[in-house]
């Protein structure tokens, strides 16, 4: 038998001089066939899914490093507003320049707004003055036109009884548009000036149709009613008497006999 076939090994005690041989061979009689499971084995390993023990309750991220009080479970770091910002020189300079530019811009905007308001107030004053002057001029022109119109109306009604047809012709507006003659090249080059002036009718841009009125007036002129007929005045005595210093004409029979 070789030395490797021996399954025994030596256990050295604290004292190296003493050694105890131990047999490492397996005895078949020491099998587990006689184990019936009646022996209760205590489970010394903790259940990983069980609730943590109360012994670990004091360890939390509270006020202390290990949370000895266990009451507060807030953040460890202070809020960002209380933390000092670590800014570089370039960022601080940019913030300073930006604040100066914003302040200057706000001043310019206020000055511009003030200038716009002043110009608007001045424009409103000038506009109101211009409107007042225009209204006064229009009132004066309308008074002159009204005065002239009343004079023409009085004159028309005073002379209408003498000649009815003339009065009717004046009342009826002209149906045919009047063509205005232009003179000079400057007036011809002006396209805005109208060449034909049309009397406006009830609809803008269309002349009044007076055909029916003209037919009625022509019919009345040829067959006037009795109240429109002019009464013929009797001839006066001077008109009936023969004129003086006029030689008497001889009868034609006496002239032929002679």
Curated annotation (Swiss-Prot):
Residues 177-193 have a biased composition (Basic and acidic residues). It is found in: Cell membrane; Cytoplasmic vesicle membrane; Membrane, Coated pit; Cytoplasm, Cytoskeleton, Phragmoplast. GO terms for molecular function: identical protein binding; structural molecule activity. The keyword Phosphoprotein does not apply. GO terms for cellular component: cell plate; chloroplast envelope; clathrin coat of coated pit; clathrin coat of trans-Golgi network vesicle; cytoskeleton; Golgi apparatus; phragmoplast. The keyword Coiled coil applies. Residues 81-143 are annotated as: Involved in binding clathrin heavy chain. Expressed in root epidermal cells and root hairs (at the protein level). InterPro entries: Clathrin_L-chain (IPR000996). GO terms for biological process: intracellular protein transport; vesicle-mediated transport. Pfam families: Clathrin_lg_ch. Residues 234-243 have a biased composition (Low complexity). Residues 61-85, 177-258 are annotated as: Disordered. It is a peripheral membrane protein. Residues 91-156 form a coiled coil. Its main location: membrane. Keywords: Cell membrane, Coated pit, Coiled coil, Cytoplasm, Cytoplasmic vesicle, Cytoskeleton, Membrane. Clathrin coats are formed from molecules containing 3 heavy chains and 3 light chains. Interacts with TPLATE and CHC2. Clathrin is the major protein of the polyhedral coat of coated pits and vesicles. Belongs to the clathrin light chain family. PANTHER family: CLATHRIN LIGHT CHAIN, CLATHRIN LIGHT CHAIN 2. This is Clathrin light chain 2. It comes from Arabidopsis thaliana (Mouse-ear cress). The lineage of its organism: Eukaryota, Viridiplantae, Streptophyta, Embryophyta, Tracheophyta.
């Amino acid at each position: 038998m070789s030395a490797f076939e021996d399954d025994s090994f030596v256990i050295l005690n604290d004292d190296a001089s003493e050694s105890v041989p131990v047999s490492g061979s397996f005895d078949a009689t020491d099998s587990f066939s006689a184990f019936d499971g009646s022996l209760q084995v205590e489970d010394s390993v903790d259940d990983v899914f069980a609730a943590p023990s109360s012994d670990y309750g004091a360890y939390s991220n509270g006020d202390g490093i290990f949370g000895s009080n266990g009451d507060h479970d807030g953040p460890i770091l202070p809020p960002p507003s209380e933390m000092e910002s670590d800014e570089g020189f370039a960022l601080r300079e940019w913030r300073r320049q930006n604040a100066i530019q914003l302040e200057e811009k706000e001043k310019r905007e206020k000055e511009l707004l003030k200038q716009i308001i002043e110009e608007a107030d001045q424009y409103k004053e000038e506009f109101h003055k211009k409107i007042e002057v225009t209204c006064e001029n229009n009132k004066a022109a309308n008074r002159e036109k009204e005065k002239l119109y009343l004079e023409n109306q009085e004159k028309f009604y005073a002379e209408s009884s003498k000649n009815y047809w003339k009065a009717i012709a004046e009342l009826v507006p002209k149906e045919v548009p009047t063509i205005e003659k232009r003179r000079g090249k400057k007036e011809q080059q002006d396209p805005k000036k109208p060449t034909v002036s049309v009397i406006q009718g009830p609809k803008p841009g269309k002349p009044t149709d007076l055909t029916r009125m003209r037919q009625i007036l022509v019919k009345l002129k040829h067959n006037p009613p009795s109240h429109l007929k002019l009464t013929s005045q009797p001839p006066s005595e001077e008109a009936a008497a023969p004129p003086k210093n006029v030689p008497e004409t001889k009868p034609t029979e006496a002239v032929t006999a002679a």
